[in-house]
Amino acid sequence: MMQKRKEYLRKLMQKRDLDIILVFSDLNNYSYDTALNRVKPGLFHYYYITLREEGFLEIDYLVEELKFQTSLKIIPFKEDIPEISLAKLTKGLNVGIIGNAPFWHLKDIQNSIYDLNKESRNILLIKDDFEIDKIKSSAKEINNILKRFDSSKFIRKTEKEIGNFLSQAIMKNSEGLAFPVCVTSMKDIKQTTASFPSKRKISEKDIIVIDAGVVKEGFYSDCTRMYFLNYKEAEDNYIKLVNAHKRVISKIKPGLYLKEIVKLYKEELKKENLPEETLEIEDLGHSIGFYVHEHPMFYSSEQENIKLEENMIITLEPEIRFSEYRLRTEDMILVKEKSEVLTS
């Protein structure tokens, strides 16, 4: 799969009449590093690819560390002046750039520079068996943490205390948080189901939404669960939402258009007598794995021709509104003829 992704980049190079593509990675986002070479930057670096060769530009004091991860050629540079090595490597060449490279890194490149982020993102869509196994492990980790969470123990505790508790649990068996843990409770759930924890204390009658994910061996997960304290009406509606959600998942398969997922949710919500007209269709899901939020983020009209493909991994996170609260659940799904829920 990694070679297929590199061939895609080489074809893109020819299509755009480019001589070299630079792929920037840092510790905030190294999805392309993982997808193309299964390496992780020590701080930041560039992978480069031409029609005939490939390699890395790496900070001089991190070269030996990178050698443990790859046999490709490594060009060292000084951490504070990467622009000199980049200008030398690309002299006389038309350059494509992928990733969020700082402008000052590229300022000395003399020829044209083309942003390829939109055109390259498709190489992250399909995962191979190795990647699927790693993403499954990441998904299992966050699912188990949220399963073990006992909301009754946090009455009169703050959202921040819940967030800290979960963050510590995540850090025990993973590289870190996929994103800051979101904890939202009763007062704010009328407006949102994903917000940073506040000093608000959990009451005897309350609703708690937790949105969290882990990074494990470089692969990301994302999951949302709700917990109810003496609020039977909301809990009953949540059970109905989860039932509708499960039926939609059972219909997820390769070839399904993203726009059809919206239709499926509205049909299943209606069967449960839930307010299908309040479904938040613009925040219904996204691809995931190499990073927490990958293309496509759905659904919007510009994506109406996008189909699911086998071995995509997506989240589905239906959210609906009531007068006093919102409800949301979120799971990760491996797209197959019989799709698999990874967070269950």
Where are these regions (language model features)?
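Active-site neighborhoods and metal-handling regions in enzymes and metal-associated proteins
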Residues: 1-344
